[in-house]
């Protein structure tokens, strides 16, 4: 099974102080091997850094800690799909064509990366965003 991981699932998978950690970490761990393949996009890496370093946690995640989590946890366990100019333009075309606005464009980028990797599933807590964009045959689920 090939699965794409959205930022909304990856961050709680890595940060045990977040309430969704118990749901997200097992889903993430399932893609460490045993015939399953996990994916994320280059844009997800930047989003993870942005979110982790801004979380209002008791034990804050500093810049170097976020960097290590991304390098040692995400990029060593998931295949990272690089996004280029054409991907960004396609994401904008998809959301604008559906009359969608604002940050949903980032989920369109994730969908494009998941399609390129031939993923069968996207793990996200933004299920409605992906459904509004039109995910086609890819299963969109929260962990």
Outline where the language-model segments fall.
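Short active-site oxyanion
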Residues: 34-38, 78-79, 116-121
């Amino acid at each position: 099974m090939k699965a794409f991981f959205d930022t909304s699932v990856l961050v709680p998978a890595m940060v045990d102080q977040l309430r969704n950690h118990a749901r997200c970490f097992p889903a993430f761990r399932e893609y460490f091997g045993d015939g399953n393949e996990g994916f994320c996009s280059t844009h997800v890496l930047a989003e993870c850094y942005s979110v982790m370093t801004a979380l209002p946690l008791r034990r804050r995640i500093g810049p170097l800690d976020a960097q290590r989590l991304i390098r040692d946890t995400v990029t060593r366990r998931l295949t990272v799909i690089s996004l280029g100019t054409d991907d960004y333009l396609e994401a904008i075309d998809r959301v604008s064509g559906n009359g969608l606005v604002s940050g949903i464009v980032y989920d369109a980028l994730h969908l494009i990366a998941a399609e390129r990797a031939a993923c069968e599933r996207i793990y996200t807590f933004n299920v409605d965003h992906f459904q509004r964009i039109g995910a086609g045959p890819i299963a969109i689920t929260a962990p």
